[in-house]
Amino acid sequence: MTSKKRKTLLDADDDNDNFDEDDSGSDFDDDEDPDQIEVPGGGRDLNTAVTYAQNIRSGVGVAPKGGIPIPISGAKIVVGNNKIKPISLLRINNNNNNIVTSVNNRNNNNIISTNGSSNNNNNSINNNSQIIKTTTVTTTPTTVGATPTVGGVALGGKLTVIPIAGRNVALDNNLSNMPKKLNNMVTAMGSPAARSSGNAGTTGSSQGGAIGSTSSYLNSLTTNELMNLAAYVAAKGSNAPPPPPPSTAANSVRHSPTGGIPNPGGNFFGGSAAASTSASAANFNMAASLLAQMSYAGGASQIRALKVAGNIGGVGNNQKPPPIATTPGSGGPAGGAPGSGVKGNNSMMEAVQKLIAMNPEYLTSGIPNTVFQMFMQSMQRPQATPSPNQPMNPGAMVTSAAAAAAHASAVAYVQQEEDEVDYEEMGVAETYADYWPAKLKLGKKHPDAVVETASLSSVEPCDVYYKLSLPLETINSGHLSALQLESITYASQAHDHLLPDGSRAGFLIGDGAGVGKGRTIAGIIYENYLKGRKKALWISVSNDLKYDAERDLSDIGATRIEVHALNKFKYAKISSDVNNNCKRGVIFSTYSALIGESNNKTGKYRSRFRQLLQWCGEDFEGLIIFDECHKAKNLCPVGSGKPTKTGQTVLELQQKLPKARVVYASATGASEPKNMAYMVRLGLWGQGTAFGNFNDFITAVERRGVGAMEIVAMDMKLRGMYIARQLSFKGVSFKIEEVPLSKEFRKIYDQSVELWVEAMQKFTEAAELIDAESRMKKTMWGQFWSSHQRFFKYLCIAAKVNHAVLVARESIKYGKCVVIGLQSTGEARTLDQLERDDGELTDFVSTAKGVFQSFVERHFPAPDRNRINRILGLYDETPSLSSVADSTSSLSNNSNITTAAGKRKGSNNNDNRSTKIKKKKRSGSWECSDSEDENTDMKRNRKRDGGNSNSDSDEANSDDDLKSDIDDEDEDHDVDSDQRSVASDASSDFNPFFSGSDSDIDPWVNARSKKSKKAQKKSKKKVKKEKTKKEITTSSATDPSGSTAMSATVVAALNAVKNRKSQLSTQDKIQDLLQKKQELKGTVTPVGVNGVKLNYGPPPKDAIERACTMKEELLRKIERLGARLPPNTLDQLIDELGGPDNVAEMTGRRGRVVQTDDGSIQYESRTESDVPLETLNITEKQRFMDGEKDVAIISEAASSGISLQSDRRVFNQRRRVHITLELPWSADRAIQQFGRTHRSNQVNAPEYIFLISDLAGERRFASTVAKRLESLGALTHGDRRATETRDLSQFNIDNKYGRQALETVMRTIMGYESPLVPPPTDYSGEFFKDIAGALVGVGIIVNSESHPGVLSLDKDYNNISKFLNRILGCPVDLQNRLFKYFTDTMTAIIQQAKRGGRFDLGILDLGAAGENVTRVRLIRFVRKHATGVAPTEMHTVRVERGMIWQEAIDKYADLFNENEGFYLSHQLRNQKRTAIMVVILESRNSSSTSSTTDLDSGSKKKKTHSKKEIMCQIYRPNTGLQVRHESLFELEKKYRKVASEEAEPHWTEQYDASVNTCSHAYWNGNCRNVSLGNDCEVGLRQRLYHVLAGSVLSVWGRVEHILNTRSNSKMQVIRMKTTEGEKIVGTLIPKSCFEPLVADLRSDSEKQEEFNY
């Protein structure tokens, strides 16, 4: 008899790899590469599987290699010289003493006959055997001794079909082991059961030959060939004819030279009575699996119709069930009555229909073994002892099966029970830890709790030797806290070192918003001043911060240090008389002012940069502070962009002053490695470092995954050049409120989408009609997508305004005050509308409409009719006033503006100041997307222009004031088109279409190469410009419209608007181009204009007319839509919340639209008679802080550095409610925004409210931010943290998995790849086709340049930010479905990475779940680096993670919830059950529904408060507390609650065994890894880890080389805390790499130490 321990015929070792605890739910064996094995429902290419499935259904066999399809009814298995071989593997579970005998039939074909007496214990499935996401068959044993019947294979356990799609690969190592496995069956072959089945002639010796030949034959088959063998068995079923008598041959496999043909319809599989049922079961489960495959590939409409038609069997609803399945009920002595098979099949299919309807995921994943086991048992019960004449009751079977389906579904989860334990056992580190200076015991405690990232907190900073010179009074008074003094000390100490290239080392302050970077910087300046270095440069983002700088210096006692504004200086030597002999102190500059230039090109100091260099001197050793230094990012941009001028200037300043003491200060400075290019003083790359240049550094870091920057940051902290703390968010609460979109809003949104799509078509057509040059088209499309993005963002924000007003009023009613953050003000759109309406407004202006309208007016590729006709000489007409107004922007019609402008001015520089203000008011010809960096560049260029035209301090001041106030446009950048045009010409480095911009087209790509040509024409342009200016002035002065008494201010503003370069907008450029073409009409050769080849003449008049008509038509449609678009968000909020008297507005706009007492709407200036414009925001802030106003509205960039917290020093100490209407999709940026109301020295913490709509993944972004806030200690709506402790990265989409998912989605939509995940089943249309159409409308799918007429993907199709911005332009339903499909794809990609062991979790925490971590050994290598020496350490640690029974009982004693306690698994494996202990956390607060103030939704939440929302912690005997939490609902599918007495033996057994027995061996009886001679630590209580810690950066390349050559694992960063309290963070080193790496590190270290513990 066969041993009960043996599992299967073909795999007796370890089939239960689906229970591997380290494979994250993998469906693959340990040594199988998931990329090499294609699996139904899980593989990428299902074509082969689908074809195979369809052929089986239609009665056609699958053609083997080079063969032709064969009808199944006459299918044959022929060996020998025949080429046709079966294509599937039959894995037969021998758990119930079945015997496989191979004999030879008269036709010399193989016979695989399974005979055996099956017992009645209905052991229908062997729990120790497993499949690979395959078809599983459980047999239905019948009465012992039943007479043999037709066809089939008698099995006591399960038949497993392994469909491997279309690839000639070996199936794992199993094929090579087949001879051994088959030979193991020799003894069984001689059993009486075998002989009684008609194989008595087979002797013992012949059995050996039989097995040898059979194994040889099977081993020679490819996996595809093996696959069809099982298909054939299933196809024959129990209705096949009886087997032929066996031949008397010594071998069961005889090779026929002629390849004999079997009898038509003959059965080649003999079997017992049980075989009928067995084959039926095989047929059934194969049918279910194949249906799943076909559904997955979209090739089976019958699956889709499953729930409706109630017929799962046919290809069409009217077809009969397939012939491949028969019923278990047909197995009588004679094979059942005729026709019973069809009835049974119908019943079986009906039952499986219900099962799949209840569990639709089976369509893609297949039906799990355990579900099938339960299902089959329920199908068998009605016919346990069937009477031969008893009619079948299909209805009873169906009902029984359906009733069992729920329980079967529950059991399905058992397989996954242990899957992810070891994968996530280390978990994700708590992101932050409380902070206190480690090595400096100086000063008083910081007034608020401060935290540090987990990785940095594990690294001790270098020793302190620097002695501060600050007065004791400053230190002891607490004006500088202990952690600020620590920063000052380390910065000063770092400045003592020189880098290998001779320049002085710098220091990076990475403190978050609100910690007090400003005062820290003031302390560093004071320290250097006391050391005799009296000069310092402080470069920041806003002029308003100059006042904060003066305040900070004053607060710490440095009253003697003066702060000078760079923009106040004239363009002359700073230390000269004209600049008041400024020879010491701090020069405060913005990044914009830093790159300013004078219009006077002959002066020696015509640029601010030269002024500063002269003032500092060549040997300058003083301070240069780059505050908010992330504004200098994009020095090394990606894609087609160019380095920003800001970044280049910051770099050049450091190069020119190599001995200067540089301090970088930015909360986000080191978060993005590519934004560190200007941080050349940190010694991370360059001479004497591991990286020769920045590109080497960036390549190395980005290749190493999520934890790479943490390693860099830790290394910098170790070297004493970096410090980063954040304010704890303890006490802060936040809630997410979902604002439902009304049907009306959705309708307006979708209509807007349609109009933008139409606009794109018109722009494309018109550009072709007027023969626009390529550079012009690039500019135009850059503007198009910029406006497109802002339009829809305005629309999204406007949808939430009413809800925000309600929340704000409610908060004020309860004694709180409100802060509302906006990204932009939309002022330029308001001014445009004022100009159109002659200053007479009837309602609030729609910003969204204004964006669209202004864009079309300025950039539609169609010229002004009159002007172009005059240019082309078609007819001559005196230009109408309107045409002049089009180009001159008729400002004179607005008396309100005149009054407002006049009111603002009170000094003799009125005209100049109003000039600049009016420049600001023009809307942007160069408007770009919402990004801070572009805001910086815009400001820079405005400054550049200002510098060109101003030489006195007041004028320069005006311009810089303009810059700071234009921050109101924040990331909207509604700035003057003229100004930015001038800027773009003045500096070819300005690139408004880059730096986070959604715009992908860069009109400045070749600007540098064209510079010389522009210079040659400069003198001609100047003459033309002067002439134009005179004409404009005259036109304005003699305006016949009635404006005869314009103020000098408005006239000056009007002239200033027109004082610009000749090419201003697309329309102007077109007219310029057409004029040139007209001049060239009739020329023989094309002439280059601005580097572009021109055609011989202008386009025909009708083409121009058509373009003009399209523009007018588009503007009419915009006007109609605009009547329904929402008004300006800022104006509406102010109006609804009590008007300007109750709302403090801190933006940069100069005017606003208000509703007067009589209900009329008018535009008024924000300026007040007693408040200068430059201090207006500061005054407004003070009114809010003094409690005069209850609401503050801030525009994000304008409020940079502003403090609105409930400060102990101010009167208004009420709690702040910070309402966010637009969440950035970066959690880092969101935290920066929250720094306005959450800062040091506050009385109470703020409350954040995120308003989200169901558009474009807003809910997911809110989840990202919520997770980050939670990790910082914030509370979800006042409750303690209750969400799953999962990796934050699962919410983050801007990472390599997100980019990979986006690429996959786009390629799937285009049909380049098969879908990784199926499209939504509830979508009525053609999903991919409809999505593709929508993406064409938003420019992600474009007309191919190389193959016109062919659609292709845009070059930046895999840019995440661009994708998120663009899909806003899709209809609401489609954009949500597309985003959902994208996130589903990303999840699938992450799961693939997990299965392959390639998933990068970031930093993992060893010991976070309470394990004991003990250090066993330490080897320390002391190595040199750029600024000194630092240790590199190799730690060996032992982790004990088990939980003894007594500890579990102690924990159990503290539990009180009825659902808490011990649980046992439903499933029995290897005669063992899993014991766990469950501790209830509490109900999960779903981020999408929690914390609404709506009473209705509150009641809904109570109703849905079910077991699915109750989250549980799980403790296991061998691995302790699990990182992954599960819901009670999921747990009860897999486990049942038991008393502690019942759980104890199971608990202690696993605990004791796990000290040296891995989970595979424990649950399966053996482990493949161990049998192959390898170590297996899966599920072990104790583990050894090797961790490389300390200064790793300098040896990182060598580490990676060894890891790559000896192990295919990635570099995993882990953190641990030993039982002795030692913190260790470093890179996990695989055992195979330990010895070679230690040897390598020994080879060149300066000093070595080794310690054993």
From Swiss-Prot:
At stage 8, when the formation of the midline precursor cells depends on Notch signaling, high level of expression is seen in the midline precursor cells and a lower level in the surrounding epidermal cells. Between stages 11 and 14, expression is uniform throughout the epidermis, and at stage 16, high level of expression is restricted to the central nervous system. Expressed in the larval leg, wing and eye imaginal disks. Expression is over the wing disk and accumulates within the pleural region. Residues 329-342 have a biased composition (Gly residues). The keyword Nucleus applies. Pfam families: AAA_34, Helicase_C_4, SBNO. Residues 1008-1027 have a biased composition (Basic residues). The modification Phosphoserine is found at residues 24, 26, 929, 931. Keywords: Coiled coil, Notch signaling pathway, Nucleus, Phosphoprotein. Residues 11-36, 966-975 have a biased composition (Acidic residues). Disruption phenotype: Loss of wingless, vestigial, cut, and E(spl)-m8 expression at the dorsal/ventral (D/V) boundary of the wing disk causing improper boundary specification. This causes defective wing pouch development and consequent thickening of wing veins. Residues 1-46, 190-211, 237-265, 317-345, 883-1043 are annotated as: Disordered. GO terms for biological process: imaginal disc-derived wing margin morphogenesis; Notch signaling pathway; photoreceptor cell development; positive regulation of Notch signaling pathway; positive regulation of transcription by RNA polymerase II; regulation of DNA-templated transcription; wing disc dorsal/ventral pattern formation. Residues 256-265, 883-901 have a biased composition (Low complexity). Notch pathway component, may contribute to the specificity between lateral and inductive Notch signaling pathways in the wing disk. Required during many developmental stages including oogenesis, embryogenesis and imaginal development of the eye, wing and leg. Ebi and sno regulate EGFR-dependent Delta transcription in the developing eye, by antagonizing a repressor function of Suppressor of Hairless (Su(H)). They are required in the R-cells for normal cone cell development. This is Protein strawberry notch. It comes from Drosophila melanogaster (Fruit fly).
